Amino acid sequence: MGDGRAAGVLAGHMVRATRQLRQLLPAVDVAWEVADARAPRASRGPGLARICGDKPRVVILAKRDLAEAAVTDAWLGRLRGDTPAVALDLAGGAADLGPLWQATREALVRSGRRPPSQSWRAVVLGLPNTGKSTLLNRVSGGRHAAVGAVPGVTRGPQWIRLPAGGRVCDLPGVLPPRLDLWPVAWRLLAVGAVGAPQVDAQRAAEALLGWVAARSPRTLEARYGLESETPPYLDQVAAARGWLLAGGLPDTERAAAGILADWRRGLLGCVSLEVPGGEDGGDARADGA
């Protein structure tokens, strides 16, 4: 499928997902909005607050094990000024879901719509690869037992009964990301929320390495054997790994793919891609400005 056709298909998914969310909201008590703890601003679905209106929400920063702990705590402090928020490590063994249940109860109590002792319904929202599926596996005990449609919602997702009480569903489709801002776009590609056809992978990998070099200077030397902490990084990584084209030119396309794969596997360490502060989440050099 060509890039243009793929983009058209993706746009169709986005429209359907947004429409389905609007139809679903009256049937739920709370929205769980999942974002990547490494990029809490960039990976939150744009427009969700407007679409959800006064519906209670809980912001869940997943993959906290891949982010800087102090930075994640700072983000939680900022987010909690508006809505309950938690950070979860969903990888590996059993996750501690206590903070999520507590935040959900808090959101429901704040809304005054439903006492937390009664059955409640939640919808899981977020961009792709932010941790939604892993969260559903954890909260459902890995069973994913569908319990049927909710009255008033004639078509759409099946609901899963939770061991802790309540029901939850994952919104199918793709919520639209914000790709017109480069500082947002490269971070979304780095965390895997969008694909390379949508964002220039080589430019994004260069921006990623610039950010990592600024926050964790020894990481690039340890991983790739780089002696210089100045760009262009892709050329250096390609040369260090022997990824060369005919004539000895650096294969920057292969280097970009390798760097992004390393990052997503956590091989470049625990580095947050955004810190509370500036509107773009980073400095001009890291953002490729």
PLM regions and their residue ranges:
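Helix-rich effector regions associated with P-loop NTPase G domains
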Residues: 1-31, 37-58, 64, 70, ...
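Glycine-rich phosphate-binding P-loop
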Residues: 122-141, 145-147, 171
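Canonical P-loop GTPase G-domain recognition
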Residues: 58, 65-125, 144
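Alpha-helix boundary/capping residues
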Residues: 104-107, 142, 240-241, 263
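Short, structured loop/turn "capping" segments at alpha-beta junctions
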Residues: 111-115, 137, 143-149, 215-219
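Short, well-structured alpha-helical patches and their helix-loop capping segments
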Residues: 92, 114-116, 126-128, 139, ...
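Conserved active-site beta-strand-loop modules that form the wall/rim of enzyme catalytic pockets
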Residues: 90, 136, 166-169
